[in-house]
Amino acid sequence: MAENDVDNELLDYEDDEVETAAGGDGAEAPAKKDVKGSYVSIHSSGFRDFLLKPELLRAIVDCGFEHPSEVQHECIPQAILGMDVLCQAKSGMGKTAVFVLATLQQLEPVTGQVSVLVMCHTRELAFQISKEYERFSKYMPNVKVAVFFGGLSIKKDEEVLKKNCPHIVVGTPGRILALARNKSLNLKHIKHFILDECDKMLEQLDMRRDVQEIFRMTPHEKQVMMFSATLSKEIRPVCRKFMQDPMEIFVDDETKLTLHGLQQYYVKLKDNEKNRKLFDLLDVLEFNQVVIFVKSVQRCIALAQLLVEQNFPAIAIHRGMPQEERLSRYQQFKDFQRRILVATNLFGRGMDIERVNIAFNYDMPEDSDTYLHRVARAGRFGTKGLAITFVSDENDAKILNDVQDRFEVNISELPDEIDISSYIEQTR
């Protein structure tokens, strides 16, 4: 792959794996783990009002969720009745929990049959969704979950499907199609078909073709749900073609960037001044965890190394590293073993790290969509956060203006001092 593709590629998608089995080691569905988290409390009514199974309610309590978010409040009652759902809501609003809870509520596990298929565009997101299924099905011991994606051996996936067939399959379209084509994965019993970050899969024509082929292998009668943070007017009709009279929920219009509690600033500087400024800011700002976004694999490696040399505990995640290494580092950061993550766009979409309260755009994102998904890493789950963008040339300034125009926000220059209470929870 050309370096330019590596730098700019948001999507982690191997088209060729449909034809050929990828090499490398595989992993079976990991054992269930208890992970803490908390969503923003918007509605006073609790999850109990949805009349969910007691096993689900117990898991929800264990996760520390008390009240459904706005999108959960809007979607879950209809989703658990089996309605088709098309939902757009900003990052950090708990969209994943909507389809995880709705499918687990309706699931009646049958040995040897896959009932739920969830697809997304990156391996990391697939891995994370499978973890969500594991934590919410904690008290449903009969429910089996497996995750399949490229970069790991397809033989291991075939083994899992043969010997320990899951009821819920999460994966990327390329690998799912490869498994369905070679008859390892039987889609004849699918009752729930879900696309997360659906626009990313349906905008790419090759990925859309894969999704369509997989869709045609599933029964006509099934529930279809699609979710994304950005759903353009052009892509909505494409989504509807997969659905029958869907309930459409657009929790906040794409013209508004209202990430509650997120302070956004920019810093004007030359490219060669970025490191010094970054170190100064990391020295003075209070943070739980920080994500720093860069535009290329080389810059990612170099900056992470530089931070470690300056005694900042940094870890890097980029497209150039093997899949196992990437997932292991993602888990290390999530488990709070490191407080600073340097990443390429690969990490920018859909990843939930609850302690992140500062996001840096060390390099300007290529468009306003990418800006939204990057800065949404900070201030998720209704917590406060800070986003700082470095602007080093006219093109950077143009993109920042696009962001302000599109989302109708005013991003001001970083002041000399920032009130700590504006971007960090004081009670922690």
From Swiss-Prot:
Catalytic activity field: ATP + H2O = ADP + phosphate + H(+)
Chief localization: nucleus
Membrane spanning stretches: none
Cellular location(s): Nucleus; Nucleus speckle; Cytoplasm
Covalent link location (Glycyl lysine isopeptide (Lys-Gly) (interchain with G-Cter in SUMO2)): K36
Cellular component per GO, a single term: U6 snRNP
Effect noted on mutating D199A: Increased ATPase activity and loss of helicase activity
Pfam families on file: DEAD (PF00270), Helicase_C (PF00271)
N6-acetyllysine found at: K36
Region (Disordered): 1-31
Molecular functions per Gene Ontology: ATP binding; ATP hydrolysis activity; ATP-dependent activity, acting on RNA; ATP-dependent protein binding; identical protein binding; mRNA binding; RNA binding; RNA helicase activity
Keyword list, A-Z: Acetylation, ATP-binding, Cytoplasm, Helicase, Hydrolase, Isopeptide bond, mRNA processing, mRNA splicing, mRNA transport, Nucleotide-binding, Nucleus, Phosphoprotein, RNA-binding, Spliceosome, Transport, Ubl conjugation
PROSITE patterns: HELICASE_ATP_BIND_1, HELICASE_CTER, Q_MOTIF
InterPro entries referenced in this protein's UniProt entry, alphabetically: DEAD/DEAH_box_helicase_dom, Helicase_ATP-bd, Helicase_C-like, P-loop_NTPase, RNA_helicase_DEAD_Q_motif
Ranges of biased composition (kind: Acidic residues): 1-19
Gene3D superfamilies: P-loop containing nucleotide triphosphate hydrolases (3.40.50.300)
Motif annotated as Q motif, chain positions: 45-73
Every Helicase ATP-binding domain range: 76-249
Biological processes, Gene Ontology terms: mRNA export from nucleus; mRNA splicing, via spliceosome; RNA export from nucleus; RNA splicing; spliceosomal complex assembly
PANTHER family: ATP-DEPENDENT RNA HELICASE DBP3
UniProt-recorded name of the protein: Spliceosome RNA helicase DDX39B
Organism for this UniProt entry: Homo sapiens
Phylogenetic classification of the source organism: Eukaryota, Metazoa, Chordata, Craniata, Vertebrata
Gene that this polypeptide is encoded by: DDX39B
